[in-house]
Design a protein with these regions (language model features):
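Active-site neighborhoods and metal-handling regions in enzymes and metal-associated proteins
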Residues: 1-386
Length: 386
């Protein structure tokens, strides 16, 4: 294994990841895994680029060296970030499924059981059908979930990056809270947040920060606008941070002016629900137990908001268009799997109350054997007052 120029994990950690993946491939009777998801390529090889809108794939045979396929404009990034020695660079105009199929034939995997990430947004129907046509003697099977299952529990180095991402997120949130004032625009708040995120060392994040105010705070995935803050507005902020592609996020709200009874009560409910959910979390606890603890606290308060969906999602390695690992593990009413030490979640008890606005309340937490550690600190959960 040849170390890349920028090595974010030890060779031993990469070797362990490859070995674990191959063990799972063997259990699933797969001879080779063709990987298209940027998170999974990064996890196994270290390779990263925001240019994954172009075709890229990592071919991992059960009993041979991996092969990486990339376009020419990304060629320099392979030795920069990845330990993969066999990289194949092809012209932009290449027939990428054909290239992939020919390499599978070359390494004598064309008549084997081939795993494809059938749940990945980066494996198009066209590519899948082309590979199926090119490899008539192969068994194409789903390889989705194999690498993801290993990503669930974070290693000590991964947790270190998560802590740093959380610190960056917290610094961005502090800057945002400080910037809120009557007459200030959402744009100006966003400028303060992003300046601090960049100065603190954040990379580009899987999703943008969400900064809204007043009635706009009811919009779940809306970003900042030119709207100016009015007296009596709730200003909602959900701020991410990213270090070496590992993410953390948190939500808070700021009330401008003298808060009324409804705002104070809603903030108390959201913060209580967040703490109750945290208190219920530790290794071995079923995910649905955590959901019930947090959601029942909200629902029984009769505040005008009901918690009906997941209360947390896994968070860690991410590239746009998302920062979460919710496709791997989410804490909801139907999830029976137990929590395990080393899992990281974005735990959310944010409430969007009609006529009031968004009560931002969320933290990134690390599950331990005895409980959870809150990674996003500095600004207390719930509503801040300006």
């Amino acid at each position: 294994m040849k170390p890349p120029r920028t090595q974010l994990f030890t060779s031993e950690e990469y070797e362990s990841r490859i070995q674990k993946t191959r063990e799972l491939m063997d259990q699933n009777e797969l001879d080779v895994l063709v990987i298209h998801s940027p998170e999974n390529i990064y996890y196994l090889s270290g390779y990263q680029t925001p240019g994954y809108y172009w075709y890229q794939s990592l071919i991992l045979p059960l009993n041979a060296d991996p092969v990486f396929i990339a376009p020419p404009h990304e060629a320099a990034l392979v030795p920069e970030f990845s330990w993969i020695e066999d990289s194949r660079i092809y012209p932009d105009t290449s027939d990428w499924p054909k290239v992939t199929g020919e390499i599978l034939k070359e390494i004598q995997c064309d008549s084997n059981s081939i795993g494809l990430e059938t749940k990945s947004r980066f494996l198009s129907v066209e590519v899948y059908e082309s590979l199926k046509y090119m490899l008539p003697y192969s068994r194409l099977a789903s390889g989705s979930g194999i690498i993801e299952s290993s990503r669930l529990i974070k290693s000590p180095r991964e947790i270190d990056y998560m802590r740093k991402a959380a610190e960056v997120s917290s610094r961005g949130m502090m800057a945002g809270v400080k910037a809120v004032d009557e007459g200030v625009s959402e744009l100006e708040i966003a400028a303060a947040v992003h300046t601090e995120l960049d100065m603190a060392g954040s990379e580009y994040t899987g999703l943008p920060a969400f900064i809204t105010s007043g009635e706009r705070s009811q919009l779940v995935h809306a970003t900042w606008s030119a709207k100016r803050i009015d007296m009596g507005d709730l200003v909602f902020m959900e701020i991410p941070g990213s270090i070496n592609r590992y993410h953390a996020a948190q939500s808070r709200s700021v009330f401008v002016g003298e808060p009324n009874k409804n705002v104070i009560e809603a903030s108390q409910v959201a913060t209580k629900a967040l703490q109750v959910a945290k208190d219920s979390m530790k290794e071995g606890v079923p995910a649905k137990t955590v959901f019930e603890a947090g959601s029942s606290t909200i629902n029984e308060a009769n505040i005008g908001y009901k918690q009906g969906r997941r209360i947390a999602y896994g968070i860690g390695t991410a590239f746009p268009p998302g920062w979460d690992e919710g496709d791997i593990f989410s804490i909801n009413s139907d999830e029976p799997r137990p929590l395990m030490a080393g899992m990281c979640f974005h735990l959310i008890t944010t409430m969007r109350v009609p006529g009031l606005g968004a009560i931002g309340c969320s933290d990134t937490v690390l599950v331990t054997k005895d409980g959870v550690e809150t990674l996003t600190t500095h600004v207390e959960p719930g509503v801040q007052y300006s």
